[in-house]
């Protein structure tokens, strides 16, 4: 007889190899065809709402690995929340306006298209990009409302954004003023804080002398009767700002010194600078000197000094006063700061505080980075080309003390990678320290309070965002672009004032935009709204900062706190969102702008929690770079290894820091995936012939080890669900992996094989095991589904068509409409766990001893061994309680327990009996049945009799 055929060998259509790259697109197509997302919505209707609001990626270019990380994390959260019993929608969004798309239109069609044509072509281009990105996001296994995303360029969104502008204007936050803003010459526009990045740059660092003018006043400040000629010395890394100098700054508490130097410079023998900087400065200038007097900075306030280029051109023959400034430091330079209010925030604030009118601020730099033609000596030059000319002019005017090359971190445009300057322009602002008209705290105060009320994942994000809000300037709302939501104001031609009915007019304009998009504002004749007044007003040509676009989506998409706007997806989503999730750069970007708009509109943040993930780097910790050649595209990984591997990599990595990826790292992820898949295959194969309705064993009648396995599974499930709840995905993956490899593979399933394969197919022993395995399989698949979505769905289809097929509440078409599995509570769960934890420890000791004996050549497999265990009372009771089933737990042919006063002692010997050809145990009763001499007594009973007596394992 071929006894192998008498075994219950496992079988399943779930293949060992996932063949993910080839098979995943089929699942994506099936989810689309069967409308899985809509099925999830129907199954979740009426449950508590959970809202993850999607931070919109920009609609330009293919997705990169950072996009994949972001979307996969969001998908894990939404799926896990749905399976935890929430109604969690996922409405993807796209950011559509702004410079990058405008640049693409200029590249393709030139720079001189009419504005309406730029807008229509930009709109079409954005739609093309969205289609490309949407396809790639869906390929990652991300489920969402892909047919109805929110787009910031949707007419309704553009209209509601204008309404948001009207509301914050009405509240008193918006004003127009001259201020230095981040300015990119290539963009020809102001930039948001989030659009500025820092890179190293080499600039000339110069020490410049401003000659004394009123020597009598200077002498009195230092307590002297008189002083010789000389100069105060400043240090700057922006020579191009010297023509615009209008003041000097010193620190009120710093000691300043008058130094007599030799050889004497042309402007005189005295130099004025901070006392602490005298020694290093004289050394750098190649001068000797002695301090003749000192004074605190506050004594110098109001003293005036001649412009250093006065001797070079009459247009610079003016003086600059000293203003006090707490921001002056002694880290570098001379302790004296030159102030050009048009090109520095602190300079601007200081000069304005001392009464300088906007009209008196010198701003010779045009939007393209060139000086106005009328500027003496340097008119028409770009500021960067002017730098060496200015240095040379200072030298000829005998005002240059020193020039050096300095490498330093400097502001750059994140799009063009070119230097950015501060430039005073007339812009529209949201005031950080403005009190709203209806009373209450300022925007800065309410935003800081909102940060304190927000949950941060990881926790360090709170301090980072807090510092940014505490120190940020007013928000520059306006941009000088064409493809953007208009700041649809009518401005008086003479006074510059807004029309008195602006809020009302904005609503009328919004209604037009709702029907025709932002193009409706472009084509609007002012007379249609203003009548005869139209001659007095002009249309404001500024557009809103794109960060206002995305930053107001909590109102335009979620519907806002009061529901007045409704929101494009207000019915599915809710305000505030439970979670915003983006990369760490969004503390400066979307988190930031959303916080400010939320606080301006409603006095609160639009989110309850912020989750931040790090950037992706290679295996050596380097940023992804085409020049370095270390870029890993998500499309390539999906096409070669499968998106499932990307998903597992994301979930396995601690996203709170940098996420490392490389071919080697992905190979390790593939190995982890294979181990999980093999576990699933074993589980599915061993419940393939099981009917959950007609063959399940009541939980109270399960074998002891099966009850323990379920208690162990319940504990694992609670831990993993807790990790999901806290957005801790890498510990969740780790726990699932150890459960599969250690709790199941190396323990429970290892022990179970004998019972599953050798007992009668319909025996209570085998059905008990299958009952437990089915619960374990369902639990495991549902816990894995948010991460390993393709694999869980594949396995679920098989399970639903076999073991679960006859259930009255048979599983739905997809695992994603399920909730986490409800495991039975066991009254003796804690006692079982304590007992079997000790049994596993003893088993590990036995296995170690068995390995020693096997290595010595005394036995082959562990089944050739017979074990004697000498145990103290506590261990003896535990071991003896299993009776003959102990040998199955230890996977040996005999296990005998002996009472002993001492700690555990294990003796192992090779069996002297014959090996059963069916179960491979070495037993004394092999050969005793004349009809079946090749097999042991229990196999004879299992095949031809009542079956072996077995209740524990």
From Swiss-Prot:
Binds 1 zinc ion per subunit. A motif ('HIGH' region) lies at residues 57-67. GO terms for cellular component: cytosol. Signal peptide: none annotated. It comes from the Bacteria. Its cofactor is Zn(2+). L-isoleucyl-5'-AMP binds at residue 582. It catalyses: tRNA(Ile) + L-isoleucine + ATP = L-isoleucyl-tRNA(Ile) + AMP + diphosphate. GO terms for molecular function: aminoacyl-tRNA deacylase activity; ATP binding; isoleucine-tRNA ligase activity; tRNA binding; zinc ion binding. A motif ('KMSKS' region) lies at residues 623-627. It is found in: Cytoplasm. Zn(2+) binds at residues 916, 919, 936, 939. Its EC number is 6.1.1.5. Keywords: Aminoacyl-tRNA synthetase, ATP-binding, Cytoplasm, Ligase, Metal-binding, Nucleotide-binding, Protein biosynthesis, Zinc. GO terms for biological process: isoleucyl-tRNA aminoacylation. ATP binds at residue 626. IleRS has two distinct active sites: one for aminoacylation and one for editing. The misactivated valine is translocated from the active site to the editing site, which sterically excludes the correctly activated isoleucine. The single editing site contains two valyl binding pockets, one specific for each substrate (Val-AMP or Val-tRNA(Ile)). Monomer. Catalyzes the attachment of isoleucine to tRNA(Ile). As IleRS can inadvertently accommodate and process structurally similar amino acids such as valine, to avoid such errors it has two additional distinct tRNA(Ile)-dependent editing activities. One activity is designated as 'pretransfer' editing and involves the hydrolysis of activated Val-AMP. The other activity is designated 'posttransfer' editing and involves deacylation of mischarged Val-tRNA(Ile). Belongs to the class-I aminoacyl-tRNA synthetase family. IleS type 1 subfamily. This is Isoleucine--tRNA ligase. The lineage of its organism: Bacteria, Pseudomonadati, Pseudomonadota, Betaproteobacteria, Burkholderiales.
